[in-house]
Amino acid sequence: MSSFINHHFYPSVCTSKHALPINPTSPFYLGIPNFRQKSRFMHLTPRCFSRQIDPLDKQKKRSFSVKECAISLALAAALISGVPSLSWERHAEALTSPVLPDLAVLISGPPIKDPEALLRYALPIDNKAIREVQKPLEDITESLRVLGLKALDSVERNLKQASRALKNGKSLIIAGLAESKKDRGVELLDKLEAGMGELQQIVENRNREGVAPKQRELLQYVGSVEEDMVDGFPYEVPEEYQTMPLLKGRAVVEMKVKVKDNPNVDNCVFRIVLDGYNAPVTAGNFLDLVERHFYDGMEIQRRDGFVVQTGDPEGPAEGFIDPSTEKPRTIPLEIMVEGEKVPVYGSTLEELGLYKAQTKLPFNAFGTMAMAREEFENNSGSSQIFWLLKESELTPSNANILDGRYAVFGYVTDNQDYLADLKVGDVIESVQAVSGVDNLVNPTYKIAG
C-alpha cells in the first residue's frame, strides 16, 4: 500500500497494537490491534509500536500483519479522500495520482449508506417502474431529519409520489416479475398498496413515531418484489471457479456474539445478508464455512476504530484448511463493477485502470462485510472477514480506497450499530444460515459430513 500513502517505512515488525500512519495526535489516528503475524515485506512495514513475539506464533505472523496494515492504510487514505480539509492533512505526503482523481468528478452526490437500500440497488434487475416507487419511500428518511411535526408534510409528499408511481406503473412492475414468482410478487404488491394507505393514516394522525417502522415495512415489500424479478442466476461464473462453493442468489445468516465485560450488552445477534448475485465465489465460500460451523466459538480478533475482524483459526494456518486436500482453500478477489454483468476476478480496479468505476457493493454502510487478504496477493482470501465501522460521510462511494480493492459480499442489516461495542476477545457463539442455503452450489460441508 506504500504506493498510495507515501509514509516513512521502517524495517520493523508490524505485529503491533498501534500503527502511526500520519500523526498520533490527530483525532483520526489509526489503532491496529495485534494479529499475531509478522510481515515478510520488511522494507515496506509501516512504523508500529511492536511487542515481543512468541516464537510459536512466528509462522502465522508472516502475512496478516500485512493485511491489517493494508486495510488500515487504505482506510486512512479513504478518510483523506472523504474529508480533504482535515486539519492533519499537512502532516501527510501527497497521495499519488491517478489513485485519487479529481474528487469533484468522483463524488456525484451523497452516498447511499443504508445497507438495505444498497442491497436493493445491487439486484440484477432493470425495472424503472419499481424504482420510481422505491425512491420516494427511501426519501422519507431524509424528510424525517426535519424536527418536529413539520417533517410529516414532507413525508406526505414522498408518500403521494410513491403511491402515484405504484398506481401508474403497477402493470409494468407485474410484467417484470419472474414467471415462477409472479403470484407471490402480486401478493406483495397488494400488501405494499395497503401499507401505503396505513402510512397515510399515520401521517394524518400526526404520529411521527409511527412513520419509520411503517416505512421500513414498505421498503421490505419493495425489496421482496424486486427479488422476485430475478429469474435464475444472471451469468456464468468463469470456468476456473465453477467447482468452488458458489452462492447463486442471496442468503441470510445470523451471527450471535457473546460480549464480555459490558454491563449494557451481553449477547448480540446480527442479521447479515450475503449477496451472491454480485460476489458468488466470496459469499459462497463464507456460507460454506458457516455450514461447517467454522466460525462457531471463534473470538473477535481485531477491533479498532475502523474495522472488526475475525476468521483466523488457531494453529499455524492463516485460513481454512480443506480436509479433502489438507491445503489452504483460497479464493480470488471478486469485484462487481456497476454496469457490468460479470464480476472482475483477480485484479483490483486500480490495476485495471478503472479509477472512476463504481462497485455494485460499495463500502458505504456501517457494517459492510468484506474478505480480508494479503496486501500483495489479490487471490489470498480464505476465511478472514471484516466489517467496516465508519460512516459513509467519511468513505463516500467511489472516493475511497477500499472500493475495488477488497471483496464486499454482504451487509449487516439488523443491529449493526452494536458492532461498535465488540472488542477483541468477544466470542462468536454461532453463525447460522436462516435462509438461502438452497442457493449454495458445490457445498463442501456436505462432503465433509
Swiss-Prot record:
GO terms for molecular function: peptidyl-prolyl cis-trans isomerase activity. Residues 257-449 form the PPIase cyclophilin-type domain. It holds the Pfam family Pro_isomerase. It is found in: Plastid, Chloroplast thylakoid lumen. This is Peptidyl-prolyl cis-trans isomerase, chloroplastic. Its main location: plastid. The gene is TLP40. The keyword Metal-binding does not apply.
